Design a protein with these regions (language model features):
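Short acidic N-proximal helix/loop "leader" segments that mark the beginning
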Residues: 1-54
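C-terminal helix-cap and adjacent tail motif
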Residues: 1-22, 194-234
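Glycine/small-residue-rich phosphate/adenosyl-binding loop
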Residues: 2-3, 66-150
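Glycine-rich, charged/polar anion/phosphate-binding loops
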Residues: 55-57, 105-110, 182-185, 205
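Small-aliphatic-rich amphipathic alpha-helix that forms the alpha element of a beta-alpha
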Residues: 56-57, 122, 128, 139-184
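Glycine-rich phosphate/pyrophosphate-binding beta-alpha loops
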Residues: 57-64
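A glycine-rich helix N-cap at a beta->alpha junction
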Residues: 91-99, 185-210
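Short coil/turn connectors at secondary-structure junctions
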Residues: 117-120, 167, 190-194
Length: 234
């Protein structure tokens, strides 16, 4: 069954919250998060990883069914086994696409290094066990989308919590291209469908500065014009 108890958290009176700007600490966490692909060899304490996962559990979810499932991988043996299986699949697919063999070899090696070089992996899975079911394919497809959106929001919570804890992370979409292979390789519980994977650890570098489209390029105000031009995040 899904969780029915309440996670303890401080309550803020809306009347005492500054409407102009978010809390400075939260803003710093959001703006300083980067997708980091190189980590120090030191393994984060398992207690810290568990706190990140607790933050994931606070994410909103469709119907509050909490369809997320997480697999924590910390041993090199398991990481290498997964990286090898996924790399072999990548090589077969790229070869079938008639891509350059040298490019394929380099991409496979890069993928193996990223997966095995991360101290901790968190595989994000979705389960439909407690989601609604429908007779028609259209609504069933939409219901699956609701579940995957829920998992993605939980994953974002993990990445922000990692940043706030002095860790870095990177979202890898590769498991989406071979979910059955990942299920088999890791012997996952039945119905756990891989959706993505987070690498987590202490950063070896600051990551690349992100480039984002300006607000006016991605937002349409239907009711009124914006009050002021937002501050640049660069």
């Amino acid at each position: 069954m899904y969780r029915t108890d309440t996670l303890e958290r401080p309550w803020q009176d809306p009347a005492n919250v500054d409407e102009a700007l978010p809390d400075a600490r939260f803003t710093d966490v959001v703006l300083n998060r980067r997708s980091v692909r190189r980590y120090l060899p030191e393994q984060p304490p398992l207690a810290t990883i568990n706190k990140l996962l607790e933050m994931a559990l606070t994410a909103p979810s469709a119907h509050n069914r909490q369809p997320w499932r997480f697999v924590v991988i910390r041993s090199y043996q398991e990481k290498a086994k997964l990286a090898k299986a996924m790399g072999d699949k990548l090589e077969r697919d790229r070869t079938a696409d008639n891509d350059d063999p040298v490019d394929i070899k380099n991409d496979v090696a890069r993928s193996f290094a990223r997966i095995t070089g991360a101290p901790t992996l968190i595989l994000l899975c979705v389960t439909m066990a407690e989601m609604d079911s429908y007779r028609d394919a259209d609504r069933s497809r939409h219901e699956f989308c609701l579940a995957t959106q829920s998992v993605a929001m939980a994953g974002q919570n993990i990445m922000l919590a990692a940043q706030a804890s002095g860790l870095s992370s990177c979202w890898m979409c590769a498991p989406m291209f071979c979910p059955t292979l990942v299920q088999t390789t890791l012997n996952l519980p039945e119905g756990w469908i891989p959706q993505g994977m987070l690498t987590v650890g202490y950063p070896a570098n600051a990551g690349k500065p992100f480039v984002r489209k300006p607000l006016e390029e991605v937002v349409v105000y239907l009711d009124e014009a914006p009050v002021a031009t937002p501050q640049s995040f660069s």
